[in-house]
């Protein structure tokens, strides 16, 4: 996908996001994980609706972290452009995943370029359904994400709705059903995310980070 040119006030490497309102994220299926259950570092391809590769996402974690903490593990996620330059960085610290411990819910810091904070994703305390807040670099809530009561994709897609602060729905984050074999023998996931075309590019990037947190 060609890089849009002349985008003012846009972090380098995020120009792609100004011209799209939907992204598809496909996790690479690792044969070692499928046959042995050994947890490998996750890798993803980020595409537009035409199937063109926009970014690559690579998890940076230690083996012990992956095996001991599983899906709740802390991680750093590097987002690379088509030239293999790191343009986004997601950091998720180790936190408790239980709603019964509201003092240490899930959180993620989003930086672009790496080292420059552009937003945060924070889990909100909720008993029945998963709730998250998308925040800007100043910690101000911009969007809210609300998930379903059941977040397991048993035989269908799982949708998380995205709302403005006044309750207007503006997008979705969807975990897509990938079939019986892939769902039961690997943790490889496919996701879709959509948002308004004119949404601030930093908020779009933070929503992409939310996809890896929820």
What are these regions (language model features)?
Residues 1-76, 82-87, 92-107, 113-117, ...:
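Low-complexity or membrane-interfacial segments used for flexible interactions
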């Amino acid at each position: 996908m060609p890089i849009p040119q002349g985008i003012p006030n846009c972090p380098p490497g995020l120009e792609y996001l100004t011209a799209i309102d939907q992204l598809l994220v496909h996790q690479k299926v690792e044969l070692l994980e499928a046959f042995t259950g050994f947890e490998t570092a996750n890798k993803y391809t980020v595409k537009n609706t035409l199937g063109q590769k926009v970014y690559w996402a690579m998890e940076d974690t230690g083996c012990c972290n992956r095996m001991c903490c599983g899906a709740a593990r802390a991680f750093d996620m590097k987002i690379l452009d088509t030239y293999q330059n790191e343009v986004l960085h997601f950091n998720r610290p180790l936190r408790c995943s239980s709603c019964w411990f509201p003092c240490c819910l899930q959180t993620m810091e989003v930086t672009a370029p790496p080292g420059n904070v552009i937003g945060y994703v924070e889990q909100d305390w909720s008993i029945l359904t998963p709730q998250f807040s998308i925040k800007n670099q100043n910690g101000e809530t911009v969007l809210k994400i609300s998930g379903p009561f059941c977040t397991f994709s048993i035989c269908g897609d799982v949708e998380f709705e995205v709302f403005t602060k006044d309750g207007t729905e503006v997008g979705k984050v969807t975990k897509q059903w990938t079939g019986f074999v892939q769902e039961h023998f690997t943790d490889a996931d496919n996701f879709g995310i959509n948002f308004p075309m004119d949404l601030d590019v930093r908020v779009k990037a933070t929503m992409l980070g939310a996809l890896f947190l929820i």
